[in-house]
Amino acid sequence: MSPDIRDLTTADDASLLALNNVEVPRVTALDEAALKRYRPVLRDALAVGAEGDPDGFCWTVGPGTDYWSANYAWTSRHYSRFVYLDRVVVAPRARGRGVARALYDAVSARAVGT
């Protein structure tokens, strides 16, 4: 059975920051200010697990956004239609349970027709 996907909420912020920052340098470090700056430009911000204590999360950005990423900028220069998956992070306690697969599948399903 695939884990349930839900939208990230502000109740997830503290856990999201902790999960994210354990994975630096594989992902860019985040603090509250960066999260506040990113949130308005995200296309999708998804989570698996309890609100306030997610097992994993991901976020995507669409075209035409002022997003602070060299990889996103490259994608924007080369493609007009895309969904840029910026990060997928899974808590160590949840690895091997299909969390990342469920997040990738949800992003793919939402991107169809984009």
Placement of each model-derived feature along the sequence:
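Conserved acetyl-CoA-binding loop-helix of GNAT-fold acetyltransferases
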Residues: 90, 96-109
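Short amphipathic alpha-helix that is part of the acyltransferase structural core
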Residues: 1-34, 47-55
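Conserved acyl-donor/pantetheine-binding loop and adjacent beta-alpha core of acyl/acetyltransferases
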Residues: 59-87
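Conserved GNAT acetyl-CoA-binding A-motif
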Residues: 111-114
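Residues in soluble alpha-helical coiled-coils and helical-bundle/repeat scaffolds
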Residues: 25, 94-95
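Short loop/turn motifs at secondary-structure junctions and domain boundaries
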Residues: 36-42
